[in-house]
């Protein structure tokens, strides 16, 4: 049986690792490959599309907590009925591509509705990087009062990185790292730093106060299970080393 409380424990211990399969990725075989690799590497949980059938397929094949992300109530609720263990209000890319921003008010309304429907399911909310700093902080304060379990930062994940050179890896993660740095000073909620992270920038996320990290395209651009396991195992060692270093300070 999946122990979703372990996810919250990993977050509390500042060692959470989330693997994002691609929130529009409905290639079942690819998602299963990522899920199997994630389980073998002992990451905290995986984040998949809010598709009930996909949730059922993954649940039938691996024993790892599943988070579903979205911006619509019904798909999220259906995914929970199918077995999803956690919920994330997020996946704003489709809005950004249309030059649209979800307002703080609409995010709060969505959170309230989800908490009414799924009061016992751990809930996280991604803070839109496109909001100004004042609105981001205001959103965090309201989410605290609504007792969401934790929040997530993001950046411009539309950017590409072809060569995985250090400069590009730093550039891709700059926005989410900056958001983490600012928000950790203004909220008591644990923060998952996500979007554009890599083995180079994961230590930076924890040094800035993150309680966990989200890894997406850095691993999910691969289709070979062994390759994904290798990368995630390296990330796991980095996270463990980062925590040991912080404990010695």
UniProtKB/Swiss-Prot annotation:
Keywords: Chloroplast, Plastid. It holds the Pfam family DUF561. It is found in: Plastid, Chloroplast. InterPro entries: Aldolase_TIM, Uncharacterised_Ycf23. It comes from the Eukaryota. GO terms for cellular component: chloroplast. Its main location: plastid. Belongs to the ycf23 family. PANTHER family: PTHR36895, YCF23 PROTEIN. This is Uncharacterized protein ycf23.
